[in-house]
């Protein structure tokens, strides 16, 4: 049986999640150690918190992000930056809400990065992955339910579906998604790196990153950078044209950037790195 002490909350593994508790005085028969246990969460409780945080976080991402791409009426035009603002904004807000619980991955690529960096054991990474996929499906599903049928529920609506623009080849789209996701993952690694000096204002950094890539890359590939984000709309709209691009591209970019940061940037002499 695998030891449960391998299941750690990301970030500071020693950090305890505490709360204010009001209760009657303890019996003197209870030892100090027994009292302290009341304020500590067991490993399985940490995993449940992580699962729920990622589930709700990814659902928020899909619900609010994709809502920014829903027209007011069939065939209606969207604001030029409505999708970029919606996705960038909800990413920043979600980081603030669940960041202290799960590091706010809400993206299987970020979870893969954490796994490759040694921040997560593989079973915990699987829990992240399942929560992210389910959360994306639930979040987009709620959006489908509350939207007018003639706008989002029609078979050909295609709202929030990621697909390459006409004229872009599969390999071009693949490279765009790989490179852009790679840049995102370099930012993730930098924020997690204790010697980079970039641990503060993480939500603002990712807000700028998502907004920038949405504006620049969105017109070409939809700026997925997240397999779960592309999977949910594909399921509901039964749209699988070149869908593989949004798995192979982001994951290949993630692996390349994570290994580059781990074995090249982090391997530099400590004196040459920002303290």
Put a short name on every predicted segment:
Residues 2-275:
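Membrane-interface helix-loop junctions and terminal tails of multi-pass membrane proteins
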């Amino acid at each position: 049986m695998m030891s449960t002490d391998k299941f750690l909350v990301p970030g500071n593994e020693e950090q305890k999640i505490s709360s204010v508790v009001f209760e009657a005085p303890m019996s003197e028969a209870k030892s100090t150690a027994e009292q302290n246990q009341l304020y500590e969460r067991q490993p399985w409780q940490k995993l449940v918190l992580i699962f729920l945080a990622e589930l709700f976080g990814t659902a928020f991402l899909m619900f609010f992000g994709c809502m920014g791409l829903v027209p007011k009426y069939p065939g209606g035009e969207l604001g030029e930056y409505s999708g970029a603002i919606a996705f960038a904004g909800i990413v920043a807000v979600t980081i603030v809400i669940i960041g202290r619980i799960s590091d706010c991955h809400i993206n299987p690529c970020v979870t893969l990065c954490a796994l490759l960096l040694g921040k997560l054991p593989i079973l915990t990474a699987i829990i992240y992955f399942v929560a992210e996929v389910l959360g994306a499906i639930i979040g987009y599903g709620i959006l489908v339910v509350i939207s007018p049928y003639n706008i989002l529920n029609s078979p050909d609506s295609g709202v929030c579906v990621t697909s390459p623009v006409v004229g872009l080849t599969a390999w071009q789209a693949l490279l765009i998604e790989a490179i852009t996701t790679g840049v995102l993952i370099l930012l993730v690694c930098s924020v997690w790196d204790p010697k980079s000096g970039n641990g503060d204002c993480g939500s603002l950094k990712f807000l700028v990153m998502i907004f920038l890539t949405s504006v620049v890359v969105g017109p070409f590939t939809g700026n997925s950078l997240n397999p779960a984000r592309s999977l949910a709309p594909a399921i509901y709209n039964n749209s699988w044209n070149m869908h593989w691009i949004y798995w192979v591209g982001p994951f290949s970019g993630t692996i390349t950037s994570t290994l580059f940061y781990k074995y090249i940037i982090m391997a530099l002499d400590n004196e040459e790195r920002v303290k």
